[in-house]
Swiss-Prot record:
Name this protein carries in UniProt: Extracellular serine/threonine protein kinase FAM20C
Post-translational modification: N-glycosylation is required for folding.
Residues that carry a glycan: 96
Gene this protein is translated from: Fam20c
Consequence of gene disruption: Mice survive to adulthood and show biomineralization defects, suc as severe amelogenesis imperfecta (AI). In addition, mice are severely hypophosphatemic and develop notable lesions in both dentin and bone.
Catalytic activity entry: L-seryl-[protein] + ATP = O-phospho-L-seryl-[protein] + ADP + H(+); L-threonyl-[protein] + ATP = O-phospho-L-threonyl-[protein] + ADP + H(+)
Membrane topology, from the record: Single-pass type II membrane protein
Compositional bias of kind Basic and acidic residues: 111-120, 128-140
Pfam families the UniProt entry points to: Fam20C (PF06702)
Organism: Mus musculus
């Protein structure tokens, strides 16, 4: 008898559970069906996301609006579906840096054809599978102030007004932008649900950006992502980049996890607006140099080197480093209290000096002896904005041809073979296109910083080999201001190739009126952890710049100007004229 009662009780529980599930599904679906049936325009509803590439365009907001809809209020907030498409919100610590996410990259979108008001919508034009324009030309663009401090005394403002910093990229097509989101795919509106999401309206409401201000209301990390194209990580005068730098230094941190892999401790921080950044804590003071007996592969990763690398990359006009900003972090409130990573949480302790410390898990320097301690719980670090998740925008990792041996005694092939470049130039992708010139740009960039740790680089898989290379992981730069590591310049010495635009900008930055050290000091002074670089590091930049220019002159004397300097400015001029 007792067993029969137990079985009946279990059946009753199961029935109640199934009824609750059915009721939940009905409550969730009925308001949406009712809203679609009563839509004033008579159109069937669509909870699909707007193509992200169109969202980036100036004319997208107007094309998306409907008669009778207001441009302001809650409707102007970004579509949560689009946010879900463009960044993975997984709690996986390796999110954005691995392929763990199961979300699939949407296929290319059809251009939306909107009929004039009062007319029937036209049938969509036939698709040209080979090549079609992404955005309509919005007409003359207003003059946008250059990034950085403005004013009559700003060296940066004057630099960015120079003709060398005014060249245009070719007109963009669907194949040239990173994101072409298929608007026909239906996404779960609960995927990016967050009770703290600002500007939310009634439960179940659709969030379709409308009106002129819609794109301006997108989070700055999203503007950064949808602005990536074949030619640049971000455009020269994109105001979202400086806004993103401010976000990195001020946005509320909602969760923290350790980044898997890597030799030293790094944390993945997620913000209230769903943006994510990689946090590298301070390990050395500004004036400390790398000990002379340290190998390059056991050197500390410096947070201020990551910050300075972004600013140097932008001054050189490469624009291949994701935005990085400094920030003071409260280790108790902004790391320990918000992390769900038990392995990280367990490493917190109070030092004999009553400071909060932690050490995490990693290959090097993750122990009680190398703990990171606050004062008493404040710690300085860098926050690098994440690139789009690998499940959405795959990246290809390439072994640097001039990679070091990472061995205490062995040397790499390029260190013993003076003709090594000839072998490289016969190997894809260096045998065609501009990849070898990209390597030369990266060489100059690394030499100016003193970075010997460039073992790999990455590109966006969508763009194939005809695209820029991304300058990631610059934490081992700016380690020695009293020593110039000439071996970093081996690719330039062996290949004797450089872009004309790069060469001219280096010459410009060597002039007194555009002195590189002064430009860097001005660019870095607005960071929250300024001064970012020790003065002797700034002076080393000018000294190393002269060494690079002398290396190019030596190549020109040996091989001739036309063989050494690749004229890429003629191509830029043609693109500017066409546009």
């Amino acid at each position: 008898m007792k067993m029969i009662l137990v079985r009946r009780f279990r059946v009753l529980i199961l029935v109640v559970f199934l009824l609750a599930c059915a009721l939940h599904i009905a409550v969730d679906l009925l308001p949406k069906l009712d809203r679609r049936a009563t839509r004033s325009s008579g159109e069937p509803g669509c909870s699909c996301a707007q193509p992200a590439a169109e969202a980036a365009g100036p004319g997208w907001a107007q094309a998306r609006s409907r008669p009778g809809e207001s441009a302001g209020g809650d409707a102007g907030w970004p579509n949560k579906h689009t946010l879900r498409i463009l960044q993975d919100f997984s709690s996986d610590p390796a999110s954005n840096l691995t392929s763990h996410s199961l979300e699939k990259l949407p296929s290319a979108a059809e251009p939306v054809d909107h009929a004039p008001r009062g007319q029937e919508p036209r049938s969509p034009p036939p698709r040209d599978p080979a090549h079609r324009p992404l955005l309509r030309d919005p007409g003359p663009r207003p003059r946008v102030p250059p990034p950085g401090p403005s004013g009559d005394g700003s060296l940066l403002a004057k630099l960015f007004e120079h003709p060398l910093y005014q060249g245009a990229v070719p007109p963009l097509t669907e194949d040239d932008v990173l994101f072409n989101v298929n608007s026909d795919i239906r996404f779960n509106p609960k995927a990016a649900e967050n009770p703290d999401w600002p500007h939310e309206g009634a439960e179940g409401a659709e969030f379709l950006p409308t009106g002129e201000a819609a794109v301006n209301l997108y989070p700055n990390w999203l503007k950064f992502h949808i602005g990536i194209n074949r030619y640049e990580l971000y455009s020269r005068h994109n105001p979202a980049i400086d806004a993103l730098l401010r976000d990195l230094g001020s946005q509320k941190i909602t969760s923290v996890a350790m980044k898997s892999g890597g030799t030293q401790l790094k944390l993945i921080m997620t913000f209230q607006n769903y943006g994510q950044a990689l946090f590298k804590p301070m390990k050395q003071t500004r004036e400390q140099e790398t000990p002379p007996d340290f190998f390059y592969f056991s050197d500390y990763e410096r947070h201020n080197a990551e910050i300075a690398a972004f600013h140097l990359d932008r001054i050189l006009d490469f624009r291949r480093v994701p935005p990085v900003a400094g920030r003071m972090i409260n280790m108790t409130k902004e790391i320990r209290d918000v992390t769900r990573d038990k392995k990280l949480w367990r490493t917190f302790f109070v030092s004999p000096a009553n400071n909060i410390c932690f050490y995490g898990e990693c290959s090097y320097y993750c122990s009680t002896e190398h703990a990171l301690c606050g004062r008493p719980d404040q710690i300085e670090g860098s926050l690098a904005a994440f690139l789009p998740d690998l499940s959405l925008a795959k990246r290809k990792t390439w072994r640097n041809p001039w990679r070091r041996s990472y061995h205490k005694r062995k040397k790499a092939e390029w260190e013993v073979d003076p003709d090594y470049c000839e072998e490289v130039k016969q190997t894809p992708p260096y045998d065609s296109g501009h990849r070898i010139l990209d390597i030369m740009d990266m060489t100059v960039f690394d030499f100016l910083m003193g970075n010997m740790d460039r073992h790999h680089y990455e590109t966006f898989e969508k763009f194939g080999n005809e695209t820029f290379i991304i300058h990631l992981d610059n934490g081992r730069g700016f380690g020695k201001y009293s020593h110039d590591e000439l071996s970093i310049l081996a690719p330039l010495h062996q290949c004797c190739r450089i872009r004309r635009s790069t060469y001219l900008r280096l010459q410009l930055l060597a002039k007194e009126e555009h002195k590189l050290s002064l430009l860097m000091a001005e660019s870095l002074q607005h960071d929250k952890v300024a001064p970012v670089l020790y003065q002797l590091h700034l002076e080393a930049l000018d000294r190393r710049l002269r060494i690079v220019l002398q290396a190019v002159r030596d190549c020109v004397e040996k091989d001739g100007l036309s063989s050494v300097v690749e004229d890429d400015l003629a191509t830029e001029h043609r693109a500017s004229t066409e546009r």
